[in-house]
Amino acid sequence: MIQVLLVIICLAVFPYQGSCIILESGNVNDYEIVYPKKLIVLPTGAMNSPHPCCDPVTCKPKKGEHCISGPCCRNCKFMNSGTICKRARGDDMNDYCTGITPDCPRNPYKD
């Protein structure tokens, strides 16, 4: 729902330009939240996006790319499964990328 509202707001503010809203998700107290990370505004049909992964017309990853941003996204591709995306602190355990999403899932074995 938040994503749709952001796109509507963006289109209302920039009705004659294509834009790319990069959303980053996080987890706060077991509730999934989505918040804007960066707004890229380009003329409609622009061939070059300032973000190498973002298609400015569709606001999605460019053809052949997996992701735009996130702790498990590097150079427009998902990081390998098992890559540490969040280091352990205190009694906490490391969190690892899955290789199929740009998000860093919480370790299910945490207390």
Swiss-Prot record:
Keywords: Cell adhesion impairing toxin, Disulfide bond, Hemostasis impairing toxin, Platelet aggregation inhibiting toxin, Secreted, Signal, Toxin. GO terms for molecular function: toxin activity. It is found in: Secreted. Residues 47-111 form the Disintegrin domain. Its main location: secreted. GO terms for cellular component: extracellular region. Residues 21-47 form a propeptide. Residues 1-20 form the signal peptide. SUPFAM superfamilies: Blood coagulation inhibitor (disintegrin). InterPro entries: Disintegrin_CS (IPR018358), Disintegrin_dom (IPR001762), Disintegrin_dom_sf (IPR036436). The keyword Disulfide bond applies. Disulfide bonds join 53-76, 67-73, 72-97, 85-104. It comes from the Eukaryota. Pfam families: Disintegrin. The keyword Secreted applies. A motif (Cell attachment site) lies at residues 89-91. Transmembrane segments: none annotated. Belongs to the disintegrin family. Dimeric disintegrin subfamily. PANTHER family: ADAM A DISINTEGRIN AND METALLOPROTEASE DOMAIN, ADAM METALLOPROTEASE. Inhibits ADP-induced platelet aggregation in human platelet-rich plasma (IC(50) is 8 uM). Heterodimer; disulfide-linked. This is Disintegrin DS-AN. It comes from Atheris nitschei (Great lakes bush viper). The lineage of its organism: Eukaryota, Metazoa, Chordata, Craniata, Vertebrata.
